[in-house]
Structure formats: structure tokens, C-alpha cells
Amino acid sequence: MFDKIEELERRYQELEALLSDPAVISNQPEFRKLSREHADLTGLVAAYRRYRRVLEEMEGNRELLADVDMKEMAEEELKVLEEEKERLEGEIQMLLLPRDPNDDKSVILEIRAGTGGDESALFAGDLFRMYSRFADVNRWKVETISASESERGGFKEIIASVEGEGVFAKLKYESGTHRVQRVPETEAQGRIHTSACTVAIMAEAEDVDIDINPTDLKIDVYRSSGAGGQHVNTTDSAVRITHLPTGTVVACQEERSQIKNRAKAMKVLKTRIMDSIQQEQNARMAADRKQQVGSGDRSERIRTYNFPQGRMTDHRIGLTLYRLDAIMAGDIAEIVDALRAHYQMEALKAQSEE
């Protein structure tokens, strides 16, 4: 393990020299790429350097054990240093885990009403508000790309971009089926209904990630329409793009400008195609190692929100919290952090077994 760390430390020193090179600084794409690599290694190198200092301090204190006057102080210091050594070893192991290259990216968020009719559409709206408020706390920007509103409120489907630093790292484990149990406002008997929505979190594709041949696209334009089907625009500003090789279809009508709608639709199209490729790769890797850590399987029921009990349960990690109002208001940091910690430990176990 330490041979690998020392190799990475040498690379870190090499990067520090490169980032002060005028030729690299003048090449902004290369400078940004090397800066990201440098930032990724900073935590590991700092932890390893502190670890080496702790080992040196422990050796110095062991030498003091032979001194009667210094023995008691040295023993106390060794105890503290041993605890720090163990903590640093765990931290270094975590920092050595392969980093998801998508973690720093913005995302495309898709929420679709599933079983449960109107109640499911209302819950889709609740989930969108929950993620929007969590985004506000993290100072991320949320922009609706397309929305199919339900006549009784909420959404049959809503697609939005969430832009900011480390969005995918925090939201990637939200993909899956979210189940809600509550009494609908129209339920006279007070019976609890169960409905569900699916959430998809996809790392936003960048131009360098995927190249789409324009001849593979079929682009249709039409008039925008509202929730009841009425036309709300007198020009053909809405855009529907079909990627012929995969059959992927994306429509956008949120903007008054056809150019802006086309740009938004292309962003979603590229992201979906890249996500599909990555899902296939993940499935192949999972088949190879017989398990998939943090798969984000879209068909998996990941969470239940029980309103009568004020309870949220995440079924993947057995986490239950009785503060549903706060969670629906966007206070999901505890859930996000617990999921990230769980899947880091799973990855660590898988790495130690290989």
C-alpha cells in the first residue's frame, strides 16, 4: 500500500511543478485538468505526510521509555499517537479508494410518477421540492428542463438540471423507487394509500464525454402546450429530439426560444446516452464480481416515506428517521452522508477481498 502512496506523492510533487510552469498555465484546458488531479491527491498526500510524522514521533517516545523521569509522559504520548496512527490508516485507506470520475459533475434529475395516480404525481412534486431545497442549502442552481404537470398538482414527470460543485457525489444514491404512504386529501375514510415515484440521477454529459453524429438525430418543432393541453405559445418553440440509433427521445418546451429549448434537450439527450453506456458498463462489472456496490438500480425500491408515522426508512442501509417534515423540507444531509459512508465501506471491503 505504501509503495503506491509514495508513487502518488511523487506524482503530486510533479504536478506542483507543472502547475507553476508558464506553458501549462497558458493552456487552460490542460491547467484545469492538472489542477483537478492535484486537488484529488492533496488530501491523501497530507494524511500520509502526517502519518510519517506520527511514526517518527512514536519512535522518539519509545526511546524515552528507558528514561525513568520521562517514561510516564512518553507512555501517555504513545497512547495518543497510537490512536492517531489508527485513525490515519483508516483515512488513508478511504482516500486510496478509486474515485468516481463523475463525482464533481452537475446532474440531470428526473422524477416520474409511478403507481398511485394523482397521489403519485403530488409526491413527485414533493420530491422535487425536497431536492430543490437541498440544492439551495448547498448553493446549487436548479433549472427545470421539462415538466408534465398533473391537473391536480404535482408532476407526471419533471426533468431538471442541478448545477454546482460535487452534485453527483451527493445525489447519486438517490436513484431508485421512492415509496410514499399517506392519507390522500380526497380519502373520506382516512385510509392510507401507497404510491411511488422513480428518481434518476445522471451525471451531466460534457462535450468531451460523448460525441453525437448530427445525422443520427431527428429534430421536430411544435407549439408549446400547458397542463390542460392548451397551446401557450403561438410560435413553434418546443423541440423534440430523437436519437435514431438508440431510440432516445427528449422534448423541451420550457423556454420561449426554440434555440434555448434545443440546447436544453441536447444536454438531456447526451446525458441519457452517456448514462445508458455507464449503466451497461456497471452491469458488466457487477456480473464479473457477482455484486454491485451502490448500483443505483432504477428499479430498486430504496426508500419509504410514511406520513402518518412521520417516518423515513432507507431500505438499503436500514436507516430510519422520525423527522419526515424536516426531510421533505430538504434536510437530507444525514441520509446523504450515511449512504456515502456505507458505500465507501462496501467499496473498501470489496477492495480488500480482491
From Swiss-Prot:
Gene3D superfamilies: 3.30.160.20, 3.30.70.1660, 6.10.140.1950. The keyword Protein biosynthesis applies. Pfam families: PCRF, RF-1. It is found in: Cytoplasm. Methylated by PrmC. Methylation increases the termination efficiency of RF1. The modification N5-methylglutamine is found at Q230. SUPFAM superfamilies: Release factor. It comes from the Bacteria. Its main location: cytoplasm. GO terms for molecular function: translation release factor activity, codon specific. Keywords: Cytoplasm, Methylation, Protein biosynthesis. One of its GO terms (cellular component) is cytoplasm. NCBIfam families: prfA, PRK00591.1. Peptide chain release factor 1 directs the termination of translation in response to the peptide chain termination codons UAG and UAA. PANTHER family: LD18447P. Belongs to the prokaryotic/mitochondrial release factor family. This is Peptide chain release factor 1. It comes from Pelobacter propionicus (strain DSM 2379 / NBRC 103807 / OttBd1). The lineage of its organism: Bacteria, Pseudomonadati, Thermodesulfobacteriota, Desulfuromonadia, Desulfuromonadales.
